[in-house]
Every structure is written in C-alpha cells, then in structure tokens.
C-alpha cells in the first residue's frame, strides 16, 4: 500500500483514534450486507477514497510515514557542518564512496512530538518534542536520494544540534515537511489551526488507496509447502542417482565440449564468483557497521549517569542489531559455493590466483564465525557440499591457522557427497544474490533442459529452506540456540557477539576486503585467432559510469582489445583499459606513432588464464593476452603453500609484462615439454610467430626511440579551474584529468575554493585518488600564481607608489619616481 491515509495495518498514515466513533464497525442489517457483497470493485474504491478524504477532520492528529534513515550529522562549525546544504554535500560524498547505510523505520507526527519507531518491534527509537525541532526542510533531486527530509533538532541537554536525514519514497518529503511544520505552528498557540488543512491537502495529494484492478486476480501459485515436494525430491534424487556423483557428468561433458562451450561455462562461473564476492563484502561491511554502532552505544551508556535514553541512542540501537540468522546462513552457503568455484577455476584465473582468493576469503569467514558466537551455526549449513576437487585444493592451499578454522566447522565442510549416505537427501544449492542477478543460461546445453533443471533445483531448495526454518523455529521454542542475539528491541546486547576471546580485530576482515578493491575476475576473453593491433579514434567525449567502463576524450586514439560486442574493450595511451560504446569510435587503418603502451601498468584485477580448452587446428595460432601478472618460476612447493598460477600452454601467448625476462626464464622448461608433444611443422610455426613478435617489438622500440616517442597532441582545449570555479566547472576539470567516476562524483559537488582548501589527507579520506588530485590541485595553484602573480605584484606596487606620492606631496618631498626622472 503506497499511502498513509488508511486505518489498515498494511499501510502507514493517519489512523483513527478509538474515541472518535471509528474504532468499531457500525451494525449492518442483512439487506445491507447482501448489498455490500454485490458492490463492484470500482464502487468500493470510491467509497473508501471518499471515506479517507472526508474523515480527516474526525481522526486524531497522528500520522505515520515509512521512511529510510540515511544518516545523522552533528552541526559543528569545526567540521564545516553548519547548514542543511552542508549535510547534503557530505551525504553525497558518503554515497559516492558507498558508505550510506539506510535503515527502514516509521516517522510519526502528532501534536506533541515527532517520533521514530522501529518497523518490526514497534518500539519508539527517538522522540523529538516539537519545541526542540529548530528546522524542517524538504530537499528534492539533489543526489541519488531524490526526496530527502531534513530535521534539525536540539534538546536542552545537547550543546550542538543534530541534523537527521531521511529518504521518503512512499510519501514525498515536501508533504511530510508540511505536516511537521503545521504541527509546530499549532503547538505555538496560533489562532487558526494549520494542521487539519495540511492533512487534508496531503490526503488529496496522495489518497493512499490504489485503484481497483482491471481484471480479476489470477489464481495464486502453490507455495513451497503446497507443492508436491516429495515428488520433486524423488525426481531430483532419481536424476542424481542416474548421473552418479556430481563431478562425473561434468567430466563427461568436458570431453565433448568445444573451446567456445567451455569458455561460456567458465565465463558464467566467473560471473557467479564475482557476485558471491560482492555479497560477502556487503555482509561483512554490514557486520562492521553493526559492531561500530554497538561500540558507540556502549560508550554512551558507560559515560552517562541516568538510564534515560540520550539523543540518537534509539537509532544507534536499531543499527547495532546484527543481521538475522538466515542472512548468516546465506553468507556461509556463499562461502562454500565460492570455494567450489575457486577449485573449478584455479586453472583459469590469475592476478590474484585462486589460492590467493582462498586466503583472502578465510579472514572474513573467521569474522562471520566469531559474530555467530562460534562454529555451531556454520557447521549446521549442509548445502552446498564441498566437491572432492575443492577439498583437495583446500588441503593443498590453506595455512595452519586457516586449517584450524576449517576443521572447526565440522564434517559439513569436510566431507564430499560420496562420503555421505546415499539415502540422505542433500538439497541442491541455488544461490540468490542481493541485487536480484541470476546466472545466464548456457545456450549450447539447451535452454529448456537447463531451465527445467534450475527450476527443479530451486523448488527443492525452497522446500529444504522452508523445512530448515520450521525446524529452527521449533528448536528456538525449546531452547535458544542463538543466545547471543539481542531481542527485537535491540537493547540487550551481548559483548560476546563481537568479542569472544583473542579473536581478530573488528575491522580486519573489512580491511582485507578493502585491500583488493579491484578483485573481480576479468570476464573477457581475447579472440581465439591472432589479429593485428587495431586502433580507433573517439568521436565524442565519454564519461565512465562504473569501474568496467573507460572515460575517453574526443580525438583520443585507443587500442582495440575486444570488438566482438556493442561495447568494445579499449586501452588508452596511459595504459588504462575499459569498455566504451562502439558508436563513438572511428576505426583507424594505421596506428599513430607512439600511441598505446607496450608495457601496461600492473593491475590488481583477477584475469582469466588463457589456456587451451580443447584441441586446436595447426593453422590457428593463439592471440596475445591482455596484461597478466608475471608468471612464477616453477619451484617445488610444500603442501601448505599456495598452488602456483597456471601459465599459458602455448608460447605464442607471450604477453606484455613488466618482467618479461623472468617469464621467459621460467617458461623454458614448460615450452620444451610442450614442443615435445607437438608436430615439427607446428613447432616451427610457433617459433616463427614468437620470432616475428619479438622482431616487431624490437622494431617498434627502436623506431620509437629514434622518434623520441613523440605523442601527437590533441586539439582539446586546456581546462583550468580557479578559486571562483563552480561545481560544474570543477566536475568538468576532474573528468578532463581522467579521474575515475567515484572521484568525480565525490569532489564534483565542491566549488573551486572548497576544493583548493582540502589538504592531501582530507582528499585521501574522500576518494582513493586523493594523492593524485592533490598533485593536480598543486599544479593548478602554481599556474594561478604564475598567471596572477605579476598582476597582483603590479597592483601592490601601484598602491604603494600612491601612498608614497601622497606622503611626499604632503611633506614637500619628491617621490622616488619623480626624483629619478630628473
């Protein structure tokens, strides 16, 4: 229900008092009831709408709105936080860095106060008496939050007021602001009451009752508990029994798959792994935010003397509540599924390798286990089981402390499917992602077949999940297995939730996640066949909207890395690569001199290892790969050491790496073994390719050195900023310097003077490119001083000369200039 003018529990809005005659339903005669049963949906809709509009005068002055609490700032001049606009500016910076965590709640307005109520427990979180509300303002369409309600409140015990910001979706902020302002006006004892008229206006603007449907409602589908779960489980079990172990059909398919089919399958697994890492990172940050709120709440309770709640403690209590157990279970399942995917992809990803990602995941896994009070909840997560390859891979990869954590999780994390009884049902795992993304179907497998299998697995998984919830609910009535979780109001909070023995620090897992911001697997394969380098010139400016896109300027010359789709992957002269739409590019026949880097910089992006997916024809050489990390020298490793990153099997896959000598030295043995397995003519062709590429690279390097690597200057106007520059000019300047979208959106809201006032540490705290921004600002300041220094000096000298001349004329002494002219 999208309204607020209803006395139904499904919506939020003005509800009637029990004292005004609407608390109980009036008596109806038998004829009236028969007439009502025959009333059409449209007539019923009109009756309800008229009732909602006409009964405003008879309802109590209590209105409720569902809002999202964005953040709370202390208005302090030291923090440059004085007005609502300052708060909106800081909100934009936090939003650009992904640090805004919304909290759903109910905002209630009556004739005495504005209250914040917990959506689930209905407990009052905050209470702001109307006389403590200093300012109320609606802010629309200033950032990604398009309807913001700003409340400035200061209680007598506070030294500085608080600024509370709410996002209002169901009822717009301007209507809620009008309601609050009218309540404040009436509380001051005005002769004419404003609030009834304001409520009537709100009801007219948003009656809150949806129109009747044009067609009768469809028959609802059967729920998970209503479907024939046993038949579906039997069907799934029969299919699994026919196929045997889950690894067997995969191996069978691998023998028949073409390189393109395997590439598509690996690409899908890579996408699933990326979304799993995203969801785990989000959950860890959510845990960290809850821990921070709990820590702040504990400090406040220790410092204050009375038991009365202080300002802001209610919202802190709500934010300190940990996620529900179901979210912990989902996170553990994604950890297990992620380990399975890493074992499958260990030969196909690099920089970092699958082994590095295993070490990377064990730190947040340890934090989640601690947050649940121990390994009990994690050990109860049965599906998905780890595969045999995964168990072998982890045994070879994990360190001593990681192995200790792994062993503590029990047999559900150690035993493969073959070690469980055949009659025991293991529900299939269907991952569900926070953003609603679903893995793409594999076309070569047959969409109907795979879709049927997916739906079957999902229905069985839903049934198993429903059964698990019922079992956990039944167990919770007998004895609380999760005693460390607080009650619904969130006030009883156990320190053991976040502190249980000598464990890892609160932010360590989050820092581990932040340490590799670009840890996503590269989903893009190079074409199978070797092609000469292609270049294109951009016809227009293009600003990247995410990390996978690349910002380009008009007339930029770009190297084309992948042009198989509508968005082409290109590399600019600085070595940065990303996707741009192909309709802004013009193909160039010959590359301009000096364009493109032969040694692109090191990147932290996980890339797919270029390996042969199947037998290849003799006349199909492999293409040079995009920049992977230097391959390690194959040295025998102990069992606890990470698995070495697989290297390309074909020597034609020589890539432009920063340490090409180490790669060539470390790959001689592999190359010789590879050559022994190939025909002589095939070996010669590959050697010729390597020699040709080496000759071309040497030739390019020599010619570039002779030309002194002259890069043609583009006819792009130079963009500078001054202290008087507007935020739009600052944003344009940042884009022209090639900063990423996060930096542009974070700093593009500042004017020139505000940007110049920030030091390096402040810039680093706002955006990851803070050091580079500071250096560019320093250059701009120096340019301003060079351009305006002489004129300012002349102005100062002119004023000084006027003063000397005036003093000389009063005393009868000639000025310096006059004296020197004689």
From Swiss-Prot:
Record field: compositional bias (Basic and acidic residues): 466-477, 671-685
Residue numbers bearing the Phosphothreonine modification: 223, 317, 629
Comp. bias regions, Basic residues: 299-309
Renumbered residue ranges of the record's region Helix bundle 3: 762-767
Region annotation Effector region: where it falls in the sequence: 649-822
The organism's taxonomic lineage, starting at the top: Eukaryota, Metazoa, Chordata, Craniata, Vertebrata
UniProt KW Cell membrane keyword: yes
Protein name as annotated: Epidermal growth factor receptor kinase substrate 8
Positions of region (Helix bundle 4): 766-785
Compositional bias annotation for Pro residues: 208-221, 623-649
GO biological process, one term: barbed-end actin filament capping
UniProt domain SH3: residue ranges: 531-590
Compartments reported by the entry: Synapse, Synaptosome; Cytoplasm, Cell cortex; Cell projection, Ruffle membrane; Cell projection, Stereocilium
Description of post-translational modifications: Ubiquitinated by the SCF(FBXW5) E3 ubiquitin-protein ligase complex during G2 phase, leading to its transient degradation and subsequent cell shape changes required to allow mitotic progression. Reappears at the midzone of dividing cells. Phosphorylation at Ser-625 and Thr-629 by MAPK following BDNF treatment promotes removal from actin and filopodia formation. Phosphorylated by several receptor tyrosine kinases.
């Amino acid at each position: 229900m999208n309204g607020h003018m209803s006395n139904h529990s499904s919506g939020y809005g003005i509800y009637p008092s029990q004292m005004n005659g609407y608390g109980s339903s009036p008596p109806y005669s038998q004829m009236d009831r028969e007439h009502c049963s025959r009333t059409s949906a449209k007539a019923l809709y009109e009756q309800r709408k008229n009732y909602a509009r006409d009964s405003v005068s008879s309802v109590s002055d209590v209105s409720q709105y569902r809002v999202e609490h964005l953040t709370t700032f202390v208005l302090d001049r030291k923090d440059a936080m004085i007005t609502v606009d300052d708060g909106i500016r800081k909100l934009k910076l936090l939003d650009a860095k992904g640090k805004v965590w919304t909290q759903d709640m109910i905002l209630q307005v009556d004739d005495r106060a504005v209250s914040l109520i917990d959506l689930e427990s209905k407990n009052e979180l905050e209470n702001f008496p109307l006389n403590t509300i200093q300012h109320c303002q609606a802010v629309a369409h200033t950032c990604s939050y398009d309807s913001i309600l700003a409340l400035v409140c200061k209680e007598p015990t506070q030294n500085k007021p608080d600024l509370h910001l709410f996002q209002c979706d169901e009822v717009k902020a301007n209507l809620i602001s009008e309601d609050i302002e009218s309540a404040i006006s009436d509380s001051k004892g005005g002769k004419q009451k404003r609030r009834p008229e304001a409520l009537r206006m709100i009801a007219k603007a948003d009656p809150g009752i949806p129109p009747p449907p044009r067609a009768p409602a469809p028959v609802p589908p059967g729920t998970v508990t209503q479907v024939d779960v046993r038949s579906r489980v039997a069907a799934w079990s029969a299919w699994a029994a026919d196929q045997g172990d889950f690894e067997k059909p995969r191996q069978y398919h691998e023998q028949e798959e073409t390189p393109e089919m395997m590439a598509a399958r690996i690409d899908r697994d890579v996408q699933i792994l990326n979304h799993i890492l995203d969801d785990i990172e989000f959950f860890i940050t959510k845990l960290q935010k809850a821990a921070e709120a709990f820590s702040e709440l504990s400090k406040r309770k220790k410092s204050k003397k009375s038991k009365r709640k202080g300002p802001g403690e209610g919202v802190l209590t709500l934010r300190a509540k940990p996620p529900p157990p179901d979210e912990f279970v989902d996170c553990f399942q994604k950890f297990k599924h992620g380990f399975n995917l890493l074992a499958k992809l260990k030969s196909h990803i690099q920089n970092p390798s699958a082994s590095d990602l295993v070490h990377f995941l064990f730190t947040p896994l340890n934090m989640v286990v601690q947050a649940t009070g121990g390994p009990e909840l994690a050990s109860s997560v049965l599906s998905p089981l780890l595969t045999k390859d995964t168990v072998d891979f982890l045994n070879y990869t994990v360190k001593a402390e990681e192995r200790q954590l792994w062993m503590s999780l029990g047999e559900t994390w150690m035993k493969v499917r073959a070690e469980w009884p055949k009659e025991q049902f293991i529900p299939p795992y269907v991952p569900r992602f926070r953003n609603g993304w679903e893995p793409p179907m594999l076309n070569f497998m047959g969409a109907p077949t795979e879709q049927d299998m997916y739906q079957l697995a999902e229905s069985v998984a839903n049934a198993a999940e429903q059964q698990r919830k019922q079992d956990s609910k039944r167990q919770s009535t007998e004895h609380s297995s999760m005693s460390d979780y607080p009650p619904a109001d969130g006030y009883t909070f156990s320190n053991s939730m976040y502190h249980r023995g000598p464990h890892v620090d609160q932010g360590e897992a989050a820092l581990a996640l932040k340490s590799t911001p670009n840890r996503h697997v590269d989903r893009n394969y190079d074409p199978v066949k070797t092609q000469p380098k292609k270049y294109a010139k951009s016809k227009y400016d293009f600003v990247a909207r995410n990390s996978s896109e690349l910002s380009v300027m008009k007339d930029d010359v770009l190297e084309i890395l992948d042009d198989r789709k509508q968005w082409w992957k290109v590399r600019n002269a600085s070595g940065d690569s990303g996707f741009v739409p192909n309709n802004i590019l013009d193909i160039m026949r010959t590359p301009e001199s000096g364009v493109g880097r032969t040694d692109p910089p090191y990147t932290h992006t996980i890339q797919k290892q270029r390996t042969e997916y199947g037998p290849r024809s003799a006349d199909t050489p492999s293409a040079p790969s995009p920049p992977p990390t230097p391959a390690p020298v194959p040295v025998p490793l102990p069992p606890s050491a990470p698995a070495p990153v697989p290297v390309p099997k074909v020597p034609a896959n020589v890539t432009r790496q920063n340490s090409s000598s180490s790669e060539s030295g470390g790959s001689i043995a592999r190359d010789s073994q590879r050559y022994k397995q190939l025909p002589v003519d095939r070996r010669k062709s590959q050697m010729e390719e390597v020699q040709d590429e080496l000759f071309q690279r040497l030739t390019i390097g020599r010619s570039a050195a002779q030309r002194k690597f002259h890069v043609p200057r583009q006819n792009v106007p130079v963009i500078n900023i001054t202290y008087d520059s507007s935020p739009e000019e600052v944003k344009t300047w940042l884009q022209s310097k090639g900063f990423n979208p996060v930096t542009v959106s974070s700093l593009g809201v500042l004017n020139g003077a505000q940007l110049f006032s920030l030091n390096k540490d402040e810039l680093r705290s706002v955006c990851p490119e803070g050091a580079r921004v500071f250096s560019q600002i320093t250059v701009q300041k120096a340019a301003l001083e060079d351009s305006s220094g002489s004129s300012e000096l002349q102005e100062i000298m002119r004023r000084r000369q006027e003063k000397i001349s005036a003093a000389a004329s009063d005393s009868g002494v000639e000025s310096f200039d006059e004296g020197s002219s004689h």
